[in-house]
């Protein structure tokens, strides 16, 4: 059962201009430590930053019904999985908000699609509730 859907698109040029101006101060503000480590290994830093920014915005939109006011950039992380596919990890108020949307006896499942087509990065996030097995 779907409990939240969010989408965002971000201009890599805009994020790149901010990164060029503020550097690590900008990336440290929006990325977790793990995401910052991945950023350092990337050739196209603007696309990476824009994609992660879009994911975080999409997460906040998917959680709109949770009415959380304490969400922070670091509470939604997107890391590369073993096969290179993005893996979404929620913590803090993002995770707490998602759990408030779950019906009794259900667990949280996170789905993410991240696309880069210069100069844009787009992210689509779906939060779903799955029946827990006993």
Write out the residue ranges for each language-model feature:
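Core catalytic alpha/beta fold that binds nucleotide/phospho-ligands
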Residues: 1-134
